Regions:
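Conserved SAM-binding loop of SAM-dependent methyltransferases across substrates and taxa
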Residues: 87-100
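S-adenosylmethionine
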Residues: 100-197
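Class I SAM-dependent transferase core
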Residues: 1-75, 81, 111-112, 118-128
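Residue-level signal for inorganic ion chemistry
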Residues: 36, 94, 174-175
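Conserved S-adenosyl-L-methionine
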Residues: 82-86
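Alpha-helical structural signal in soluble globular domains
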Residues: 13, 26, 97, 185-189
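Glycine-rich phosphate-binding loop signature in dinucleotide/nucleotide-binding domains
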Residues: 72-76, 138-141
Length: 197
């Protein structure tokens, strides 16, 4: 069970990112973090186990991408792919905070995809699908936004997912370092139009 102080930390951290979470969203995010903490060792979801680390390194890190995501989608009900989702980050966070989105989380590790599906069911997130697949072999309708966090280099990320991107769609890579170097390695037809500090 997550500590009450974490709710305050989540609310304040989100506010610092320009997000006003509802009580319901805060509760769902904390329950999700609790699921990661409880099942993390069993499913090898993440190296982080401490509640404060889950808050800062996973929840708030994923929430930081919500304002640019909202600017891009304009609040429309679009399809989002989370490539290499792991524990469902950032896909489940997007689904909680932006319920209008149709989010598909894909991971090559079956137990991680199973965790995402179970977490979505326990949190009653009807806008989430989990797929156990290699993203480069993913079939089906294209996605308006393809996101990744700690997945691959920008060049590999775009190459592996290009077939799944809808015309006019965008890639959203949550990257902490090497952005300029990786951007220089992108195919010439890929335009990098925004970098969030």
């Amino acid at each position: 069970m997550m500590e009450p102080a974490l709710a305050d930390g989540l609310t304040e951290g989100a506010r610092g990112l320009g997000l006003e979470l509802t009580d319901s969203q805060t509760g769902l995010l904390l329950r999700y973090a609790d699921l990661i903490a409880r099942w993390g060792r069993v499913y090898n979801l993440t190296a982080l186990r401490e509640p404060n680390e889950l808050l800062t390194h996973h929840l708030l890190d994923s929430l930081a991408a919500v304002p640019p995501l909202r600017r891009q989608t304009g609040g429309a009900a679009v399809r989002v792919l989370d490539a290499g989702s792991g524990a469902g980050l950032p896909g489940l966070v997007f689904a909680i905070v932006c319920p209008e989105l149709d989010v598909t989380c894909v991971d090559t590790v079956g137990k991680k995809a199973a965790f995402i599906q179970q977490a979505a069911a326990e949190l009653d997130l009807r806008n989430v699908q989990a797929r156990h697949a290699r993203v480069e072999r993913l079939a089906g309708p294209p996605f308006d936004v393809i996101a990744s966090r700690a997945f691959a280099s920008l060049a590999d990320f775009t190459a592996l997912t290009r077939h799944a991107l809808a015309p006019g769609g965008v890639w959203m890579a949550l990257k902490a370092r090497d952005v300029e170097r990786e951007a220089a390695a992108l195919d010439a037809d890929i335009e990098m139009f925004h970098v969030e500090p």
